[in-house]
Swiss-Prot record:
Taxonomic lineage of the native organism: Viruses, Riboviria, Pararnavirae, Artverviricota, Revtraviricetes
Post-translational modification: A fraction may be phosphorylated in insect cells and HepG2 cells, a human hepatoblastoma cell line. Phosphorylated in vitro by host protein kinase C or mitogen-activated protein kinase. N-acetylated in insect cells.
Keywords assigned by UniProt, alphabetized: Activation of host NF-kappa-B by virus, Activator, Apoptosis, Host cytoplasm, Host G2/M cell cycle arrest by virus, Host mitochondrion, Host nucleus, Host-virus interaction, Modulation of host cell cycle by virus, Transcription, Transcription regulation
The protein's name: Protein X
InterPro entries noted in UniProt: Transactivation_prot_X (IPR000236)
Disulphide-bridged cysteine pairs: none
Cellular component GO terms held in the UniProt record: host cell mitochondrion; host cell nucleus
Gene name tied to this protein: X
GO biological process, one term: DNA-templated transcription
Subunit structure: May form homodimer. May interact with host CEBPA, CFLAR, CREB1, DDB1, E4F1, HBXIP, HSPD1/HSP60, NFKBIA, POLR2E and SMAD4. Interacts with host SMC5-SMC6 complex and induces its degradation. Interacts with host TRPC4AP; leading to prevent ubiquitination of TRPC4AP. Interacts with host PLSCR1; this interaction promotes ubiquitination and degradation of HBx and impairs HBx-mediated cell proliferation.
Family per record: Belongs to the orthohepadnavirus protein X family.
Organism: Hepatitis B virus genotype B1 subtype adw (isolate Japan/pJDW233/1988)
Length: 154
């Protein structure tokens, strides 16, 4: 069974943030009105929150009180941002954030479809989420397939 994720829009960064949902939750939560994020509170989420869940492939930052820093997605059909205005993930983002100078945008998207959409997204692949913003994460993924090891930053 795939992990349950909560999708929230962060208007300050124009990204969709995927956050793990507790096993006791029901349905597909979308807290507050679209675009609203609950105020960040370090004490709101215990450091071991979600440790009982089986979330294969989530980075080690997934359960921090700030939420996972690598699981940020933009939807090219739903919003306009600096990144998706160019229709492709800039190659500089590969090099700076992921250290993947030899990896093409197509390869990166295919990898994410396999690793993210097929494993994490509850209802399967979501075609409209095609452009990925992976700015700044310095955490390793802890998933099973060996290819995930290249998600350490250079």
């Amino acid at each position: 069974m795939a992990a349950r994720l909560c999708c929230q829009l962060d208007p300050a960064r124009d990204v969709l943030c995927l956050r793990p949902v507790g096993a006791e939750s029901r349905g597909r939560p979308l807290p507050g009105p679209l675009g609203a994020l609950p105020p960040a509170s370090p004490s709101a989420v215990p450091s071991d929150h979600g440790a009982h869940l089986s979330l294969r492939g989530l980075p080690v930052c997934a359960f921090s009180s700030a939420g996972p820093c690598a699981l940020r997605f933009t939807s090219a059909r739903r919003m306009e941002t600096t990144v998706n205005a160019h229709r492709n993930l800039p190659k500089v983002l590969h090099k700076r954030t992921l250290g993947l100078s030899a990896m093409s945008t197509t390869d990166l998207e295919a990898y994410f479809k396999d690793c993210v959409f097929n494993e994490w997204e509850e209802l399967g692949e979501e075609i409209r989420l095609k452009v990925f913003v992976l700015g700044g994460c310095r955490h390793k993924l802890v998933c099973s397939p060996a290819p995930c090891n290249f998600f350490t930053s250079a």
